[in-house]
Amino acid sequence: MNEDRKKRGLANGKFFTAVAICALFLGSGNVMAAQTASNDSQGVQEQMQSISVTVTVVDTKGEPIIGANVIEKGTTNGGITDLDGVSKLNVKPGAILQVSFVGYTTQEVKATSVMKVVLKDDTELLDEVVVVGYGAQKKVNLTGAVANVDVQEAIASRPVTDIAKALQGITPGLSITTNVGGIGVDSNIKLRGATGSLSATEGTSPLILVDNVEVPSLSLVNPDDIASISVLKDAASASIYGTRAAWGVVLITTKTGKKNDKPRVTYSNNFSWSTPTVMPQVAKTYEGAQAMLLAANRSGASTVSSIGYNVDEIAVQKMKEWYNTYGGMSQSELGEMQLGRDFEERGGKYYFYRQFDPLDMFMKDWTPQQKHNLSVSGGSDKTTYNISLGYLNQQGILKVNTDEYDRYNFNANVNTQIRDWWSVRANVMFSRSTKSEPYQYTSGYTDVWYYLLRWPSFYPYADYQGIPFRSAMTEIAQANRESLTNNFTRVNLGTTINPIKGLAINFDYTFALLNDYQKRNGGEVGGWDMFNSSNPLTYNSSFYGATHNRVVERSRYTMSNTFKAYATYEKSFVQKHNLKVMVGMDAETREKLGHSSDRRTLVNFDKPEINLAIGDQYVDGTTYHNDFAAAGFFGRINYDYMGKYLLEVNARYDGSSKFPSGDQWALFPSVSAGWRLSEETFMKWAKPVLSDFKVRGSWGTIGNQDVAANSFLSVMSVNKSSGWVIDGKQVPYIGIPSVVSPSLTWERVTTIDLGFDARFFNNELGVSFDWYQRTTSDMHSPGETLPSTFGSTTMPKVNSGELQGRGFELSIDYNKRFACGLGLTARATLSKIREKITKYNNPNKNIYGNYEGKIIGEIWGYETDRLFQYEDCYQDADGKWFIDTNKVPSQALYETGAFKYGPGDVKYKDLDGNGEITYCLLYTSDA
């Protein structure tokens, strides 16, 4: 009885919630089928042609289902069941009723006057299959930290152009960032931290697999081709992939055709736009100039001079006058700069008064993007196929000489059943992307965006006498174009043999080729040189000199061959014991080649080509050629008893060419277990609320080979010049051999993970939690300090360091479908991790390097207290401000030249209490 009351109470809440929400959307419309017909003849005729139906909806135990939807198929006519599971409505004779409720399978039945409909439990959520390493498992049977991404929610229902950005915020622990906001830029993907290992070349970037084969970037994949996405987070779930899965795996499968399905041609498109988000506000001319003067006055100066402009009190007043007179006019109305109106020369110095908004002049309010997808899929009883084409076009945010990005995708999957026991498959994936943008004469923190916002708003961005002033806008407008083209081709051939029931033997071979080509076309930028402090009206035909009068061509080539062979055997015993065993091996070879050529002095700026340049030619450090090979043997055992007690054991024996021949191979085991408490008889009391509850834990270790190649080899550097001249020529020299450890081998990444997964209210509400600890041991780090008599003070790297990360992840999702057809989906995620170096050879613990106890991401520096106030300072007879050291600590260490601290400046804390700010610590032992 108590269980029935709880069930009814829960159902009542759902019933009244559904009624309230549906009332908001439907009002008093046509759902009320029993409403009296109107007086017109049409209403009378409609009512005469309908029959009254009473529907009772129950579950398989005969309990009434409250709030179930009862809808006349093909119409909006319907209702919801009451507290007794009953719904009454008028429908057309012969109508089909659709009866549904969350957590139950929808039924379609022919309408009769009195009906009883039994809804069965919908086991879809319990039977949901998640793609894991070399196979798939029921979600409820997972024992590792595996997140399944709802592709429909994350990708299909949104105008997604980049899969990485679509995953942002979907899975806790998966961090997606971009360094810049431009188009065609790859995202940085990190899983459970940012560092993982101090020797990792790409930090905690997970392995990206599409149909079990690595792809170099998610930007190469068309979002429309994706069927499923799984994120394998802990060692137990990711270890099956071995060599490069130390930081987890993002596992993607692409769409395939269906058997006995007629050919389906699908076309979709999306037109959208992007806008700048948070933009800085630049002060008005006179406001910025006044602030500059106030700062200068504090140091005893009455004017400000920088590059080609000057500011004094007269200039501030004239800026106000200009703003009051012309501030309401647009730049097009104002036209070119006019001497006397917009700027003037006084005493051999130039003063500028005109107001500019460089962001408004330089950037669009919005920029378009479009994508198109065309696919053909289908199948017979033997063969299935899915072929798709995709096109994406994005334009940049610049108003002049804007950048543009195009991506073309082709993907084809074909599967054929040759015999009952033998099938073959083929997949071809091709992606081509091209990005075109103006050549950048400056880079890093001094790029065009930096210079666009560096100068005050009176900096001249208009022409004078038909010639522009030097600025970021001038640089972009006059720049030649540079381009980057990526071509990625992948061909996969595979076969599956089923010699006996339950046994599947798979063979797969994949060839992949990535080719990048970049062409940078330099030139010259000229105009009035605002960086000439003596006379900004000096014409300069080449602001950046001969360095950028060049053409650069770069190419990268990566070819890989991957072979996989694995067998899976499944068997159930007495319908209680379920066993799955998998064994296999994989091998990979990879060749990388890169080249860059740079030639100066272009004959014609409009035709920037290597053979049309006549100056010096250079080959830079991006030229390389290297090879890599890896292989591994793996096995996995899955066991469950009645779907309640779950166990998984993995092992890999991996080898990598990155280590010495005697240390290339190592064994990496893992184990995980789970317990579905919700299936126990003692948990029946929670069933009305608790749909499923599982606790799980895992331990495992994976080898990390994401380290510098050939670090165990002693090499000698070759230098072009020794400084010695013999026979009129400089003599090259070869350096002494580098000091290395000949036994440098694998780093080991060990993860402990404890978590639970729970679902409530007929699977509407889900909660998942994980606590984990990841330890990278045998980390490549400096060995013991060598004596100076050894001949080299460079410490060779050895397997001695250790880095540990601890964190947690929480995910909550809610899915609700109301009687009126309205659906509600909500998701919240939370994650936190702290990475700490627990072993490292740095006896002095210099804070500018790595040391034992260092928290990754920590910042050493002065602690700020507040801003200096007037009462902290005093003025001398000349009106200059000084700090009163009787009241606050002296900051004289950083008072240089004419600058003195005063009101409004940042005040540093005196941590050691000696009354003055001194230099910061160099070693943690000084603290």
Task: Please give the residue ranges for each predicted region.
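Short, small/polar-rich motifs associated with maturation and membrane association
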Residues: 1-395, 399-411, 423-424, 845
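Acidic surface patches and DE-rich sequence motifs
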Residues: 59, 72, 82, 788, ...
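Detector for glycine-centered tight turns/loop "hinges" at secondary-structure junctions
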Residues: 62, 85, 104, 212, ...
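Extracellular/periplasmic, surface-exposed regions of secreted and cell-surface proteins
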Residues: 157, 205-207, 211, 413-432, ...
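Conserved small-residue
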Residues: 266-348, 596, 815-922
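Low-complexity intrinsically disordered tracts that form flexible linkers/tails across taxa
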Residues: 280, 427, 435-447, 840-846
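A subset of solvent-exposed loop/turn segments in beta-rich extracellular surface proteins, enriched
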Residues: 280-281, 289-296, 452-465, 528-541
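Conserved small/polar residues in nucleotide/adenosyl-binding loops
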Residues: 923-927
